[in-house]
Curated annotation (Swiss-Prot):
It comes from Neisseria meningitidis serogroup C / serotype 2a (strain ATCC 700532 / DSM 15464 / FAM18). Catalyzes the reversible cyclization of carbamoyl aspartate to dihydroorotate. The keyword Iron-sulfur does not apply. Signal peptide: none annotated. One of its GO terms (biological process) is 'de novo' pyrimidine nucleobase biosynthetic process. Zn(2+) 1 binds at residues 13, 15, 98, 247. Substrate binds at residues 15-17, 41, 135, 218, 251, 263. Pathway: Pyrimidine metabolism; UMP biosynthesis via de novo pathway; (S)-dihydroorotate from bicarbonate: step 3/3. Homodimer. It is an enzyme of class 3 (hydrolase). This is Dihydroorotase.
Length: 344
């Protein structure tokens, strides 16, 4: 039986929620990943160092006994952010600030309305070597939802990089050929996280044969040519600029299957197996370890994990749902098969 042993991966983009939801989902990530970069879009958002440290304590308390998993904490960037907050965050071990353009995604109401007014804050981030994580979509209602990432590149990303050229930027959960091209052409201070869904699915998987609410995420799935461009990027010559970031975003089944369903896919349960499928299909299994376990750590300036995990070429059926607080959670590829399995 074929096996593949790799350095234990890190998830560089993860939503863990809070309370009972946190307790339900964190064990799935903790058994696969050594560390994860924790998104700050709680209600209310994680905007201060005190907020982040309190949230980290709640995550640690929710971990299974004996787990060595480490959450890497971030702050939610708001219009009120200051250079002083950046210095305070760096001193407290916060790894990054996250940009949510106001209204772009789940719990983004407190997001930034005009990033260019925060240039002094971004300059301080560059000075302190603290990362800037970007949800790269414009929220202009006149821009088609499928074009919002490409528009963001021209309107925001390129001008910001021109004004703060040494800022370390992660273009999060990229979905388009344009985003891949930007990262490929930018300096070594720009990298990207890529989700399993944007490497495996296209917008037909969301819309053909009926609306598939469990395939609805933001940024929304794009056409097949974009998916292929992402696979080419993560397996190509400059693959070191791309890394694993699941954007696993749990929402109760009832919140997904309704007239105005929430955006987000829960992939943490089988994340590494899903990525293995991508790299296997691309004939690039030898590049999975760098993508999952090395590139993110290098960009964040942290050491690689010292232990390993082993994948077995063995089919598994993903559960139709799992418990989630008072309700249930539908994982990515619920009821379907994945050709790999992590040995636990």
């Amino acid at each position: 039986m074929q096996t593949l042993t790799i350095i234990r991966p890190d998830d560089m983009h993860l939503h863990l929620r809070d309370g009972d939801a946190l307790k339900a989902v964190v064990p799935y990530t903790a058994r696969q990943m050594g560390r994860a970069v924790i998104m700050p879009n709680l209600k209310p958002p994680v905007v201060s160092v005190a907020d982040a440290l309190a949230y980290k304590a709640r995550i640690m308390a929710a971990l299974p006994e004996g787990s060595a998993f480490e959450p890497l904490m971030t702050l939610y960037l708001t219009d009120q952010a200051t250079p002083e907050l950046v210095r305070e965050a760096k001193a407290a071990g916060i790894v990054a600030f996250k940009l949510y353009p106001a209204g772009a995604t789940t719990n983004s109401d407190s997001g930034v309305t005009d990033l260019f007014k925060l240039i002094p804050v971004l300059e301080e981030m560059a000075k302190q070597d603290i990362l800037f994580l970007v949800h790269g979509e414009v929220t202009d209602p006149e821009i088609d939802i499928f074009d919002r990432e490409a528009a963001f590149i021209e309107r925001v990303m390129k001008p910001v990089l021109a004004q703060v050229p040494n800022l370390k930027v992660v273009f999060e959960h990229i979905t388009t050929a344009e985003a891949a091209r930007l990262v490929l052409e930018a300096g070594d201070n720009v990298a990207a996280s890529v989700t399993p869904q944007h490497l495996l699915l296209n917008r037909n998987d969301l819309l053909v044969g009926g609306v598939r609410p469990h395939h609805f995420c933001l940024p929304v799935l794009k056409r097949e040519t974009h998916r292929q461009a992402l696979v080419a990027a993560v397996t190509g010559e400059k693959a070191h600029k791309f890394f694993l970031g699941t954007d696993s975003a749990p929402h109760a089944k009832s919140a997904k299957e309704n007239a105005c369903g929430c955006a987000g896919m829960f992939s943490a349960m089988t994340a590494v197996e899903l990525y293995a499928e991508v790299f296997e299909k691309a004939g690039a299994l030898d590049k999975l370890e760098a993508f999952a376990s090395k590139n993110g750590a290098r960009f964040y300036g942290i050491p690689e994990n010292t232990d390993t995990i082993t994948l077995v070429k063995q089919s598994q059926t993903v559960p139709a749902s799992v418990p989630y607080g008072d309700g249930e959670l539908v994982p990515m590829r619920a009821g379907g098969e994945i050709g790999w399995m992590v040995q636990y």
